[in-house]
UniProtKB/Swiss-Prot annotation:
Binds 2 manganese ions per subunit. GO terms for biological process: proteolysis. Belongs to the peptidase M24B family. The gene is pepP. One of its GO terms (molecular function) is metalloaminopeptidase activity. Catalyzes the removal of a penultimate prolyl residue from the N-termini of peptides. This is Probable Xaa-Pro aminopeptidase pepP. Keywords: Aminopeptidase, Hydrolase, Manganese, Metal-binding, Metalloprotease, Protease.
Length: 467
């Protein structure tokens, strides 16, 4: 990770991001001057309590500043190419409890901005910019993210309708610095997944495995989680966003350890996310049924990743994952009939109901994917990215096969689809729960760069599970 750390020793490229946003705003300015105005997340207290709500920086603000401070704001003069960061002034009463805050000089040295002022200078600065442009400047802001005290006197227009979408689309293609942040988040999360695999040896409850994962992330510099971890043993793995993480690893029917644990978890490093899923055998070795499903899912992922390159149609990759799943389930006898017919009837959606993946960045389900959740085609309804993938985008590839009674039983009861499912064979697989394998991949001009190094080969996982 030396090369990555060398990149991250520099400043977050906020100015380059501001220029990218400015370029996209040109068509909305009609030749007029303008500014971008963004606010950081405010400090908020828990209801009926004097403790602050856990802080999460607003992503548009961070994208154009690289600043994690609360109660700050920024102004980017589009015509002058000048980026100004405003940070809170010193509050003597707050210093008693929290120490001295960052000074404007320190912020100037740390962030990729042209100047740093304090927030009490915001309105006078806005008035000065408006005057310098002769009252013709447009202020681009985001609706519901502007404080009542902020004044846009002297601006010809305050546009709150386009900036959010422009920033979200700009975020799709990552630069070298952002890829380095994502690679670092993946490196830390891979260590945490290994710790979770090892913890499964002695754990008797899902929460122990979750604890091992989170502790390893924090110890390695990822203090926050990208999302609430999913640690799902046995049939809990069939619940896509299972969140309880408090079930026993002992099967109450057999009084033996459950077959496997699905771990979907990723640490957040300096605002950028990892999103990795692995399945591990609780007893140190996959059962025959789990191994069969695991091999199918691994094949789905391997073939789909191999398809990635600039311009690939994501719907085509997703459809290919379904084809591989159908072939695998036909081999096992869970499905029966002709592959093409099963595909056209969308029977595989019963076992693989979600989309193949999503964009990844500052958000786990990152912006710019243009999903269509009203799509009448059930195979594509939950696909979070639609269209062709640009070079520089980062996408998760997370195929899965699940045995969720609530989802599958309507297909069994339906005369349209029940003939394709052999329930006698299916009955052997309910206890597998679900298998999902997820990596984070950069799309390049001629291929891809897989950022995820967490073990997924069966022999390596089984070795770690007993080491």
């Amino acid at each position: 990770m030396a090369a990555v750390d060398a990149i991250l020793a520099g400043k977050y490229p906020a100015k380059a991001h501001a220029r990218r946003v400015a370029e996209s705003l040109q068509s909305h300015r009609n030749g007029c001057p303008g500014i971008v105005y963004l606010e950081a997340q405010k400090t908020r207290l828990i209801e009926d309590n004097d403790e602050p709500v856990p802080f999460r920086q607003r992503r548009p603000f961070f994208y154009l500043s690289g600043c994690p401070l609360s109660d700050s704001c920024l102004v980017y003069d589009l015509s002058e190419d000048q980026l100004t960061l405003f940070i809170p002034p010193v509050d003597p009463e707050d210093v008693i409890w929290s120490g001295l805050p960052m000074s404007t000089e320190q912020a100037q040295n740390q962030y990729d901005v042209d100047r740093v002022l304090v927030t009490t200078e915001l309105n006078s600065t806005l008035a000065s910019i408006a005057s310098s442009h002769g009252g013709k400047a447009i202020a681009f802001t985001i609706a519901d993210q502007v404080s009542e005290s902020t004044q846009f006197h002297g601006f010809s227009e305050v546009n709150q309708s386009v900036l959010k979408g422009v920033i979200e689309q700009s975020r799709v293609v990552k630069d070298e610095y952002e890829v380095a942040l994502l690679r670092k988040a993946n490196d830390i999360s891979a260590k945490a997944h290994i710790a979770a695999i090892k913890a499964s040896q002695t754990a008797v409850n899902e929460r122990e495995i979750e604890g091992a994962f989170i502790a390893t992330c924090i110890a390695n510099g990822a203090r926050e989680q990208s999302y609430h971890p999913i640690v799902a043993c046995g049939e809990n793995g069939a619940i896509l966003h299972y969140g309880k993480n408090d079930d026993t690893l002992i099967d109450p029917v057999t009084n033996q350890k459950k077959r496997n644990v699905l771990i979907d978890a990723g640490g957040e490093y300096r605002t950028y996310c990892a999103d990795i899923t692995r399945v591990i055998p609780v007893g140190g070795k996959f059962t025959a049924e789990t191994r069969q499903i695991y091999d199918i899912v691994l094949q789905m992922q391997t073939e789909c990743i191999a398809m990635l390159k600039e311009g690939v149609q994501w719907e085509d990759v997703h459809a290919h994952a379904h084809r591989v799943a159908i072939r695998g389930l036909l081999r096992l006898g869970i499905l029966r009939g002709a592959e093409d017919e099963i595909f056209e009837k969308r029977v595989s959606v019963a076992f693989f109901p979600h989309g193949l993946g999503h964009y990844l960045g500052m958000d786990t389900h990152d912006t710019g994917g243009n999903p269509n959740y009203t799509d009448k085609d059930t195979m594509f309804r939950y696909l979070r990215v639609r269209g062709r993938l640009p070079a520089g985008s980062v996408i998760t590839v997370e195929p899965g096969v699940y045995f969720c009674r609530f989802i599958i039983e309507p297909y069994i009861k339906s005369p349209e689809s029940n003939k394709y499912i052999d329930t006698n064979v299916l009955d052997r697989y309910w206890r597998v729960g679900g298998v999902r394998i997820e990596d984070n991949v950069v799309v390049t001009k001629n291929g891809y760069d897989n950022l995820t190094t967490a073990p997924k080969a069966v022999d390596e996982i089984e070795r770690l599970a007993v080491s």
